[in-house]
Amino acid sequence: MSSLGNLTVLTGPSGVGKGTIVRKILESHSDVWLSISATTRQPRSGEIDGEHYFFLEKKQFQEIIDKDGFLEWASFSNNFYGTPKKIVKEKIEKGTNVLLEIELEGARQIRKSFPEAFQIFLAPPNLYELEKRIRGRGTETEESIRDRLSIAEKELIAQKEFDAVVINEDIEKAFKEIEGFMGLKL
C-alpha cells in the first residue's frame, strides 16, 4: 500500500510570486499535481475542460455545493469558482502530492474542510517591493495597483494564520524553502 500524498495550500498577495513558485515546483517535481478549479464562467480561447478548469453550468455547480463537494468555493464577477473535493482526495489517496494556489478566503475555508492541509503564506519583503513587482508586470491600471496593494495590506495581517510564512526576497531561496515544507525530494 502506498503512502498518502499531502495537500499544500499556497497563498499570498497578488504579485508576490506564487505563479512563478508553482511553475518551478511543477517543472522540478512530476509527482506534484496542481489542483484544477471548477468554474461556471465560459472557457476562454485555448482553455481545455479538465486541464485549465472544470467548466460547469451553474446548476451543476450548485448541486456540488449542496452535496458538500467543494473544499472551498466563492463567487466572483457573477461566476462561481471552487476546488472539487473528490479529485483532490483521490489524488492524495493514490500518494500524489497536491498543490493548491489560492486566495486568502479560500485558504480559510480549506482550514475548515481539510484541516490536515499544510498552508504556506508567501509574503513580499515589504509593500514597496510588492508595488515594484506589480508595476513591473506592466498589465495593471493605477487604480488596480492601488486596489491590489490595499488588499495585500489586509492579507499580510493574516499571515499568522498559516503553518509557515516564506518571505520571497529571492525566488530561488523561496522555492527551496517551499520545497522543504512540502517534503519534496531533489
UniProtKB/Swiss-Prot annotation:
Keywords on record: ATP-binding, Cytoplasm, Kinase, Nucleotide-binding, Transferase
Has UniProt tagged this entry with the keyword Zinc-finger?
no
Any single Pfam family the record assigns to this protein: Guanylate_kin
Q: Which SUPFAM superfamilies match?
A: P-loop containing nucleoside triphosphate hydrolases (SSF52540)
What superkingdom does the record give?
Bacteria
Q: Which residues form the Guanylate kinase-like domain?
A: 5-183
InterPro entries cross-referenced by the UniProt entry: GK/Ca_channel_bsu, Guanylate_kin-like_dom, Guanylate_kinase, Guanylate_kinase_CS, P-loop_NTPase
Q: Which SMART domains match?
A: GuKc
Could you tell me what reaction this enzyme catalyses? GMP + ATP = GDP + ADP
The residues listed in the UniProt record as binding ATP, with positions renumbered to this chain, are: 12-19
Q: Which GO terms describe its molecular function?
A: ATP binding; guanylate kinase activity
Q: So what EC number does this one have?
A: 2.7.4.8
- In which compartments does the protein localize? Cytoplasm
Which cellular component, as a GO term, is one annotated location?
Answer: cytosol
> Record's family?
Belongs to the guanylate kinase family.
Task: Please give the HAMAP family that the UniProt record associates with this protein.
Answer: Guanylate_kinase (MF_00328)
Q: What is this protein called?
A: Guanylate kinase
Species the sequence originates in: Prochlorococcus marinus (strain NATL2A)
Q: Its encoding gene is what?
A: gmk
